[in-house]
Amino acid sequence: MYLPRKAKNKMAVEGLYKKRIDGRKFDEVRPMIAKVGVVPSADGSASFETGGTKAMAVVRGPRTLHPQHMQNAQKGVLRVSYGMMPFSVWDRIRPGPSRRSEEISKVCEWALSSVVDLSGFPNTVVDVFIQVPKADAGTRVAGLNAAAMALAHAGIPMKEMLTAIAVGKADKTLLVDVDKAEEDFHDGEG
């Protein structure tokens, strides 16, 4: 959502947020749509939409990990790849990996590794591919939610179901599920 400079300045002068720009309460989330099985040829897949953000995740595996020197004899390996499609934002982004997408891949891998139990799959790999075709705000959150659903859809054992939400701060007030205008105006998620 585009927010003119005048509106941003007005929000700052008035101490911001007696209510949020889109009318939500501070702790209210945007409408969400979650679906599994969106890619029939995948071992597991899901899509997650909130506000103007959509993420899709595909799971492949468990399958034998090659090269063999990367295998773990005690448990399987989880690999996560996160990417934003070039047309996902107003300012077209360069296709392919970026430092930001590699960092988010590692954060998602770390978060998902804490709940996934691959002890029953030694010497294997489970690959999770997250793509964001439409970005408003909270892309890593949408990606994590889609990935967790795709892992469950693939039947990968998990200790618990992972969920994520973006929280921002405005004038000492916490805002749950920040939108693009809030994210740009403050130090929000990303």
Task: Please give the residue ranges for each predicted region.
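Polyanion-binding surfaces on beta-sheet-dominated domains and ring/shell assemblies
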Residues: M1-G190
